[in-house]
């Protein structure tokens, strides 16, 4: 079976919205899942998606959660993800580490929960 990228992304986004995500965060998360599948990393793409929906229903993932900075010193920061969507928390941590590296030459972000 062949599924086109845009169709996959839109379908995943729609499911995320039906499970409590706002449109913007659903779109970003769905894009991450679809991109992983497109890149051949199926374990973080569509194959993971049913488990994510199950985890939302069980309360293991909080669709309203946003990461919070807990501590930082120079180019090193520690964040609490508050059980938010993993691919959104990971993207935020990566972007923050890049920003720290642009300022300091190195950036390290640790994310818990």
Predicted segments, located by residue:
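N-terminal and secondary-structure boundary signal
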Residues: 17-20, 35-42
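Short, contiguous, pocket-lining structural segments
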Residues: 4, 21, 25, 85, ...
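Active-site cofactor/substrate anionic-group-binding motifs, chiefly glycine-
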Residues: 47-98
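Generic N-terminal amphipathic, Lys/Arg-enriched alpha-helix
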Residues: 1-19
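A glycine-rich phosphate/pyrophosphate-binding beta-strand-loop-alpha-helix module
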Residues: 91-113
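Glycine-/proline-rich flexible loop or hinge segments
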Residues: 13, 36, 73-83, 105-108
